[in-house]
């Protein structure tokens, strides 16, 4: 990937990649480090993308994988600082603020699917393809994730 295309890609997907990383990692420092890793890895890859949607799907999958790598490396640092959470979701309006905060507290397997389905508007079959899981598993994760999300939101009220 050449530098001009990379720069355009970064400008187009900066918010999406950062939100995914922050949802996974829960703090600004790790998210910043992982953000750099995502785009360095994208720059080094020699893959041709069929369309912007193909690039976006590849970027989401790669971002989630890099976030998981950071979890494995830093499993002992599993503490999320509230100040960082509030900073990341400060762009949300009041109605979405509590929902975003609750999503941050879900396990990663639910976060991924809920984020891609509701925030990136992917269909279940597209999510299944990106995450290499069956479509029915996507539906199950969505259902269970919504139930867990409802439980978290009910507790906060």
Residue ranges of predicted features:
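C-terminal edge and immediately downstream basic/flexible tail or linker adjoining helix-turn-helix-like DNA-binding
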Residues: 1-7, 81-83, 93, 129-130, ...
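A short, charge-rich alpha-helical start-of-domain segment used by transcription regulators
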Residues: 1-19, 23, 32, 43, ...
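C-terminal flanking helix
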Residues: 14, 18, 39, 107, ...
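Structural recognition of an alpha-helix C-terminal capping motif at a helix-to-coil junction
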Residues: 19, 33-40, 53-65
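Arg/Lys-rich amphipathic alpha helix in sigma70-family domain 2
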Residues: 50, 61-81
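DNA-recognition helix of helix-turn-helix
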Residues: 64, 68, 131-155
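Internal acidic/polar
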Residues: 69, 77-104, 123
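A short pre-motif secondary-structure segment
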Residues: 113-117
């Amino acid at each position: 990937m050449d530098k001009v295309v990379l720069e355009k890609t970064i400008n187009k997907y900066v918010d999406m990649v950062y939100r995914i990383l922050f949802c996974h990692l829960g703090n600004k420092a790790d998210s910043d480090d992982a953000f750099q890793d995502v785009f360095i890895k994208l720059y080094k890859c020699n893959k041709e993308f069929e369309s912007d949607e193909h690039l976006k799907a590849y970027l989401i999958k790669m971002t989630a994988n890099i976030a998981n790598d950071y979890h494995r490396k830093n499993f002992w640092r599993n503490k999320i600082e509230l100040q960082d959470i509030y900073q990341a979701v400060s762009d949300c309006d009041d109605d979405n603020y509590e929902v975003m905060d609750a999503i941050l507290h879900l396990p990663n397997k639910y976060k991924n699917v809920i984020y891609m389905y509701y925030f990136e508007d992917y269909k279940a079959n597209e999510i299944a393809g990106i995450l290499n899981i069956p479509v029915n598993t996507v539906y199950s994760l969505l259902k269970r994730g919504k139930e867990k999300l409802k439980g978290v939101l009910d507790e906060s009220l």
